[in-house]
Amino acid sequence: AHPILPLIFDTNLAAVGDIGAELPTNRFNKPTDAAIQVEKGLDLAEKLLGQRPTGMWPAEGAVSQEVLGMFAKEGVKWIATGEHVLSKSLDIPTFKRNTDGIVTNPEVLYTPWYGQLNRQDDVAIFFRDLSISDQVGFTYSGMSPEMAVADMMKALEAAREVSTTMDRPLVVSIVLDGENAWEHYQNDGIDFLSLMYETLTTTDWLKTTTPTEYIEKYGPQIEKLDRVFPASWFQPNFATWIGETEETYAWDYLQKTRAFYDRANASDNYTEKQLEQAFDYMLLAEGSDWFWWYGSDQSSGNDDYFGSAFRNLLKNVYSSLGEEPPAYLDIPIISPSAQLFDKQSDSILTSNQSL
């Protein structure tokens, strides 16, 4: 369902990176749901790929110290996210770059770090190089494959030249998440990718590797972070999914529906099949994309469609159990005149209905 795992774990984590965020009246706090989302994602990957992944890119690169154990429990050896997470975890403002966009301290960024769990199954975290990755995602499509690959190799060699001596090779993580870059490339990026991989594999001062190979070889030398800062790959917070009024309504709707499911599950009124179906809809409603389109920071041009789909998933939780969905789920969240919050009574109110 592509959830923002730290927010499913606890919406209060949003305030760590955004102290001014408007938090839901009803705190969403379901660590078990976050763990199930990880398990089901890996189950699906195993079904499709024929083997269980040993690493993963969490949805939107959203991570926090609180969710690391969920990856370890499922046998995940490494995850990846954006460089903002590392800079905030190390309490530095940002990674400085020279005029060519090259990180001035590559020995910090170009290495995985262990997210400390105080046991043997610590999870290694690889951090995306923002500059090089964004060049692939947004710039190289306007260049010939030859010019684009030459520019990438120039950046990699420059990073190598400014590196200090380490006891192991540096590793550069180039990651694309959701940019839909290839449709903007000539020949869908095939020419660029073919030349890029050919160049990477024939350059004598560079070696391609997988995260698993790297940590198997150099794991004992990898340092540990004291704590992983809660953030996503492209910003040092979760502000795209929480913190604005519309997003607050959506999280409150989600929490109210989840509380209803808990009551239903604790009763003897429903069959196991009904409860399983209702919970599947609940997990789908926890996906990040519904919250992405709420608020003023993102616009699809048709936000009503996504808002309606989100509310329909919540309705399906009720209807799967043979119950009538509450009337407030018929009222669009994006209509500011349609609902008010009664902060004092800790409930959601609409213009004509209270929960």
Question: Over which residues does each language-model region extend?
Answer:
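CE4/NodB-like, metal-dependent polysaccharide N-deacetylase domain
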Residues: 27, 31-58, 154-175
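The substrate-binding groove and active-site-proximal loops of carbohydrate-active enzymes
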Residues: 20-35, 51-59, 134-149, 180-187
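Beta-rich nucleic-acid/ligand-interaction surfaces
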Residues: 60-67, 86-90, 216-219
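Aromatic-lined carbohydrate-binding surfaces of glycoside hydrolases
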Residues: 1-20, 64, 86-87, 134
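Short, surface-exposed basic-aromatic patches at helix termini and helix-loop junctions that form
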Residues: 48-49, 65-80, 190-203
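Short, solvent-exposed turn/loop segments enriched in Gly/Ser/Thr/Pro and often Arg
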Residues: 1-2, 55-63, 212-215
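Active-site and substrate-binding clefts of carbohydrate-active enzymes
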Residues: 14, 95-136, 140-350
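Acidic, His- and aromatic-enriched active-site or binding-groove loops in soluble protein domains
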Residues: 15-35, 72-117
